[in-house]
């Protein structure tokens, strides 16, 4: 996914603050409301009236669009989306969802309340946009600000008031925020491991490591929920770690690193790709990174052998899974992680046998020119099939395609 850095965007709390001037676009001020679970947002418009506000971005897959009730702060009159108005300042309220006792699902990307003055605000459904304006800043109660991402960028996710691990080195790759339960983990060591993993992933993808620190948020979630996930935002990602009875499980550090590495790939990848490619490649590179640093020796191929038959539609190929997910059947989605990661691991091994690497091959498979690498339904196009067959051998590519991708439509 593409990330465009602005001159004043120092993706770092509390160093997010950018000097405000009259040309910086609209300004969003987030303030604590009268209740702990309420935030008040004040939007100062850019330029001269008339103004028009556009709907907030919605979480992909959501069926009921969310739209806050907007009022002009000068006269308390309602403001309607997509209709011109002259009010210079508009306000609205955001209601935070209290984090469940068993922990919040990071992949749900909800706006959460952990305790008074400790919360996570996401862009989805909450931040309307001024039509025709420049990129604006979203400022938190402590005065720190972050630019509102463009529409083609990942969403804004803003943690506030959460504990943060002190930075132990110059030019860190990330800043780690976390809930209270995570204090039982060796957080400085995990933060250092993630710094090294991010550098390794950047090398694997043949991209430049982040020049400004990312924000990483770790949230515990009880294993009884049977649902642990993660989400990537704009220079920030959120990941769950497993807990039991209010304590991290022995598997928590490894799960944190793997989920965080997966989300880091989403931020490092700079070109739009089919969903199955995004998810499966991120999962494979996360597994590969853990093996590289001797944190875990599991392979994607072994995981497929152990879990493949237990998955819904385990016999389906990745092409069919991609089509079904595009049609709305997300029961095929787990195949991207398990069968998809095994596909990339097997392909990577075959490439190495032929004196090639995945890092050198990826740009030729659409990473630099995405319109040349994939068909609309997510299949490799003719040029990519020929490239892969020519690199690892026609018979090997045919066998790998048949086993993992399935027959094309």
Regions found by a protein language model. Name each.
Residues 178-191, 243-251, 268-273, 329-333:
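Second-shell loop/turn segments in exported
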Residues 214-224:
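Acidic helix-start/capping segments at beta-turn-to-alpha-helix junctions
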Residues 1-8:
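Bacterial N-terminal signal peptides that target proteins for export
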